[in-house]
Every structure is written in structure tokens, then in C-alpha cells.
A protein has these predicted regions:
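First exposed extracellular module after export/assembly in secreted or surface-exposed proteins
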Residues: 28-224
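N-terminal hydrophobic alpha-helix used for membrane targeting or insertion
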Residues: 8-9, 129
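Bacterial Sec-dependent N-terminal signal peptides
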Residues: 2-5, 11-43
């Protein structure tokens, strides 16, 4: 009788331990009150939120029609929201541009909507063909901003944009009047010749082509 009781007790403890481990995997980290309030203000209808930290940011993973993650700093400032959307939810100009591109026959793997502080919304279509994977970045009006080979390193694949210094913004406004900033990135590969440079992707009207085109402006410590 005692043996049976002990056996049941051990089985119960083992089951409880596994259940506790599962709960730990799903638990959200604690976040500062200003951060919680900032999230609730931006997404008032979202109830179930899981918080984690990535690359120095607090990241809220949630569902609001689609799976999404919102990136904040400790003080509650919003910097980016990445939303996993279906292809059908893309703006029509983006779908038209993709379907007229050289990648139209490639398999669509994933589609992301990137909303970031200080710059325009960007849509990323991930495509693959045999052993090749490419990320295509489009503006909402269907301009292809850039195409990047996917290295399968999905850790911090999309990050909040780097804050553009005022001197660079002034230069762009002066040389490319009416330009729309869609991407800001500081090159961080020490093996590249442009290490430490700031790369700014803009969309600017080309009068010769009579259409909007994507241009890359490269700065070295405030100079183009």
C-alpha cells in the first residue's frame, strides 16, 4: 500500500514539474509601468501579450488580426512594429510590382510589414528558389528599395531603424528635395570597406525616368 502511494506521489511530482517547465517557457518577463502604458495606448484592444528582450529593446509579442511584435525602449518610446501578414494583405502596388519582377516565379515564403519610427512603412517579401533565398524590400507604392540575399540567420533579422543625424537629414533634403526616407542603417561589418558608414535608402522622383526610384545615400561621419 505504501509502495503504491509513493509511486503515485512520484508520478504526480514528475507531472507537476513538467507542467511548471512548460509554464516557464510561456511566461512573460516583467516590464516597467511606463512601457505597459505605452503599449496599451498604442494597442488598446490587445489582451494577451508576451514580453521579451532583444538587442537592448523590450519586445511585445501579440496577436491583433495578425501575429506581430512591437519594439520599445525602457522609457516607453515605440520604435518598431513587425507584423507577419499574408500576401493578399499587401498594398496593390506592391503586389503588382512583385508580379512584374524577375522574382515572380519564385516561391513566396513569408511577408512582413515593418513600421518604424521616423521612416515610411516597408514591406518585405521573402522568396526562395532552390538553394537561393532573397528578401525584397518594397515601399507602399511599389518601389523596390533593395533585395538582400537571406543568410538564414534570423536572429534580429529586422531591427528598429538607426536615428538619422540632423546633418544627414539636412543634406538629403537639400540635394534630393521631396525624398522619402525608407531605411537607415549603420554598417557594422568590420571586414567591409564601408564599416561605420551610415547608409540611407530614399525614394526620389527621377524626372528623366518620370517615376519614383530608390537611391542609396552613403555617409561617412556626416559627409556623403
Amino acid at each position: 500500500m505504501k509502495l503504491r502511494i509513493y509511486t503515485l506521489l512520484i508520478a504526480f511530482c514528475a507531472a507537476w514539474s513538467l507542467h511548471s517547465c512548460d509554464n516557464d517557457d510561456d511566461e512573460s518577463i516583467a516590464v516597467p509601468t511606463p512601457l505597459q502604458e505605452a503599449f496599451s495606448t498604442r494597442y488598446p484592444n490587445v489582451k494577451n501579450v508576451k514580453w521579451e528582450t532583444k538587442a537592448g529593446y523590450y519586445v511585445a509579442d501579440f496577436y491583433d488580426g495578425y501575429e506581430a511584435s512591437a519594439w520599445f525602449t525602457t522609457d516607453g518610446n515605440w520604435h518598431m512594429t513587425e507584423t507577419d501578414i499574408p500576401y493578399t494583405a499587401l498594398p496593390d502596388p506592391v503586389k503588382s510590382a512583385f508580379e512584374a519582377s524577375d522574382y515572380k516565379t519564385w516561391k513566396r515564403d513569408d511577408v512582413d510589414k515593418l513600421e518604424r519610427q521616423g521612416i515610411e512603412t516597408v514591406y518585405v517579401i521573402e522568396v526562395e528558389n532552390q538553394n537561393q533565398e532573397v528578401d525584397l524590400y518594397y515601399s507602399a507604392d511599389g518601389v523596390l528599395i533593395k533585395s538582400i540575399a537571406d543568410t538564414d540567420d534570423h536572429e534580429n533579422e529586422h531591427l528598429p531603424t538607426t536615428q538619422l543625424p540632423a546633418v544627414m537629414k539636412t543634406f538629403i533634403d537639400g540635394k534630393y528635395a521631396g525624398a522619402r526616407i525608407v531605411e537607415v542603417d549603420v554598417e557594422d561589418d568590420k571586414n567591409d570597406w564601408d564599416f561605420g558608414f551610415t547608409e540611407v535608402d530614399i525614394i526620389h522622383f527621377d524626372s528623366g525616368l518620370n517615376r519614383n526610384v530608390s537611391k542609396e545615400v552613403l555617409f561617412d561621419k556626416g559627409r556623403e
